[in-house]
Every structure is written in C-alpha cells, then in structure tokens.
C-alpha cells in the first residue's frame, strides 16, 4: 500500500509565486530520501516508479535522476518526441545542450535526493520561476551529474497556458528579464568556481534577444 497524504492549501500561492509553492510542498517532506515535483496535469508512464527503483538499486550514488520526456497537448496527443539524454550527463553539458536546443528540460522529469537538495540551498529563484528549474538542476548535479532512467518516460503537457507557452507582452517582458538574470547568475556561478561558462557571451546575448523577440 502507498502512504499518500493529500493537502489542500487555503491559497493559490503558485499563481503568484511558483517557487514559494514549491518550497511549501518541499517543507511537507518527512523522511523521504528522494522527491519529485510532479504537476497534476502531466503524466507518468505506468512503469516510471518501478524503473526508478531499478536504476537506484544499481546506481545509487547520484543526487539527481531524470526521466526522458515527450510533450503532449490538452488531448494527450504527443506533439513532440524530445531527444533522450545520455545516461550520465554532466551539469555543464546539461546547460549547454538545453540552450543549444539539443535537449528539453521541465521540472517534473527530475528526481532529487532530499538531503543533498537541502544542502545545496534548494531552489534558485527567478521571476515566474522561469529558468529556476535549469539553475536548480545545475547546482544539484554539479558534483555527480544527472543519471537518466531508461525505459520509462514522463509526458509533459503543453496546455497553452503554461508560463513557457504564454506570449502576452507583460509576461514576455518578465521572462526576458528572468532570462537576463539567469545568464548573469550563470556567469557568476562559474566565475566563483574558476570555471568557464558552458555558454559564451555571444550565445547568451543571442538567446536573450530570441527571448525578447
């Protein structure tokens, strides 16, 4: 039997501050060694949990695990078959591949070791939580990389109302500023480690311009 706790919050905090909503969900964790922030409109394939435990039995050293994803629409039709990750992917290569459009990433496809997540400072916050998932995965996976679980996928729903799918002028402006903040944070992060950012200044500028346009 599964020990499941349902929690109804008195306010819709995620509407105004998604990171704050994630934080209070994380605060509910008790003795769980791992967690996944899974959305109520996305879908796990039936064998996802089974394949995670199989992966864990043989590859228990990692702090970040990952499911490959496909994108679905509101009718559960697959609209995009996303490229699969290498089974072991370094944190820097993760960033490089995302921002050169070779892989996709969404928060519900990642499983984190709870103790390590807390030790690394939890979520990296940007406006609208935009780019926060990428930054958070980078920090958590810096030491050991990301281990991808085979033979099971997460189906991430692009409903047309997700932040990443919203195109009104106000939201686009906030997303552009969040992207600039993220790239500034990224440069500072690698500078603090005496390492070179996986994205050049030219690449970061082009990506920012793309976000604005």
Describe the function of each predicted region.
Residues 67, 88-170:
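Conserved nucleotide-sugar donor-binding catalytic segment
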Residues 1-11:
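Acidic donor-binding segment of Leloir-type glycosyltransferases
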Residues 73-89, 100:
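Acceptor/aglycone-binding surface of glycosyltransferases and processive sugar-polymer synthases
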Residues 41-43, 69:
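Acidic metal-phosphate-binding loop of nucleotide-sugar-dependent transferases
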Residues 49-80:
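Conserved donor NDP-sugar-binding/catalytic core segment of glycosyltransferases
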Residues 10-30:
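Glycine-rich, basic loop-to-helix element that forms the pyrophosphate-binding segment
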